[in-house]
């Protein structure tokens, strides 16, 4: 039996290409003094690791590597912690299943 070597998610994400819509991010974290449990969950739940804690203890998002999977939308949009919309036409991720 021939077993294929496993490939890390990060290695697969490397092949994707992105057309960033500068000045029009499709995800925004709303201003907060302390992060909600939902925002803290995004630090680990986002498969592209777009969310991080800054030096002031606030959650920030970098949409440049977003794969538009909707995980953050399901977790944090219902609570009002983020604003999420589809990228404008022609912008966003281009999957390259490498």
Curated annotation (Swiss-Prot):
A GO molecular function annotation here is:
iron ion binding
Taxonomy of the source species:
Bacteria, Pseudomonadati, Pseudomonadota, Alphaproteobacteria, Hyphomicrobiales
Q: Which domain of life is it from?
A: Bacteria
* InterPro entries found in the cross-reference section: 4Fe4S_Fe-S-bd, ETF-QO/FixX_C, Fd_FixX
Which SUPFAM superfamilies does the record associate with it?
4Fe-4S ferredoxins
Functional description taken from the UniProt entry = Could be a 3Fe-4S cluster-containing protein.
Under Gene3D superfamilies, the record lists: 3.30.70.20
* Keyword list, A-Z: Electron transport, Iron, Iron-sulfur, Metal-binding, Nitrogen fixation, Transport
Instruction: Name it.
Output: Ferredoxin-like protein
- List the PANTHER family hit by this protein, alphabetically: FERREDOXIN-LIKE (PTHR43082), FERREDOXIN-LIKE PROTEIN YDIT (PTHR43082:SF3)
GO BP, one annotated term = nitrogen fixation
Protein family (similarity comment): To ferredoxins from P.putida and C.tartarivorum, ferredoxin I from A.vinelandii, ferredoxin II from D.desulfuricans.
Report the residue ranges that make up the 4Fe-4S ferredoxin-type domain in this protein: 57-87
Q: Pfam families this protein is in? A: Fer4_ETF_QO
């Amino acid at each position: 039996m021939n077993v294929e070597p496993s490939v890390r998610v990060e290695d697969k994400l490397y092949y994707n290409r992105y057309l960033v819509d500068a000045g029009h991010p499709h995800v925004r974290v709303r201003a907060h003094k302390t992060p909600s449990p939902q925002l803290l969950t995004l630090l680990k739940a986002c498969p592209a690791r777009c969310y991080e804690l800054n030096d002031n203890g606030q959650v920030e998002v970098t949409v440049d590597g977003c794969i538009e999977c909707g995980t953050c939308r399901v977790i944090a949009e219902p609570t009002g912690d983020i604003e999420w919309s589809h990228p404008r036409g022609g912008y966003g991720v281009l999957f390259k299943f490498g």
